[in-house]
């Protein structure tokens, strides 16, 4: 008998800082997306894959936070990339924060409901709700906003009810002729992209609000010197000289510390010693 496969793709949508990246990391039980308190940390769509057995493949796509101001400022580039996904995905996760409903949430709902896809209202950060008695009235309020497929309260941070969300989606997967991705993959990111994200996370962690939104990290080379050691060369691109000074710091102290944090994280990821070279350049400058 021919093997049956079940697959489905869910796009994770919401305003900035509602915990989208934390949720995708929990859903696939692996850290592939940067988590930070800084708004607009996620710069592009990131795909995570959760394989259950050898038949079920749950695909999740983390997206940059949506806000009216950010969509306008970026001339819709990242926004268009996110909306382009809507034609090929099966489910939409609208991520909401605790028991609030804002104009931004309304704005996003009005955008995504036009695509006529099943929308799940995911109430995140329930670990921060002091009294769970406030949840039921909020769920009733949400049910009047739209005919949501499901309204599911979760905590991306603690993992509460993540298994319920995963199970609900698993039960709604469709039969497909073959898996979308190989069953040994957790993400569609290549190794250089993962390294770049690890470095960018440490820059965000250390520099915080000092860090320009426009920063980009590109991994140029990963060279295995031997079984126990690798050399990694990465470039941090910024818009202007002032941004370059912020990242480098006085006598190079900031970039050295960021490099040390990134190196330790990379050594943990690769389980080997890492020699990390970081260069900070202005965009459009060739090395």
From Swiss-Prot:
It is found in: Cytoplasm; Cell membrane. Residues 40-44 are annotated as: G2. Keywords: Cell membrane, Cytoplasm, GTP-binding, Membrane, Nucleotide-binding, Ribosome biogenesis, RNA-binding, rRNA-binding. GO terms for cellular component: cytosol; plasma membrane. GTP binds at residues 14-21, 62-66, 124-127. SUPFAM superfamilies: P-loop containing nucleoside triphosphate hydrolases (SSF52540), Prokaryotic type KH domain (KH-domain type II) (SSF54814). GO terms for molecular function: GTP binding; GTPase activity; ribosomal small subunit binding; small ribosomal subunit rRNA binding. Its main location: cytoplasm. Residues 14-21 are annotated as: G1. Monomer. An essential GTPase that binds both GDP and GTP, with rapid nucleotide exchange. Plays a role in 16S rRNA processing and 30S ribosomal subunit biogenesis and possibly also in cell cycle regulation and energy metabolism. PANTHER family: GTPASE ERA, GTPASE ERA, MITOCHONDRIAL. This is GTPase Era. The gene is era.
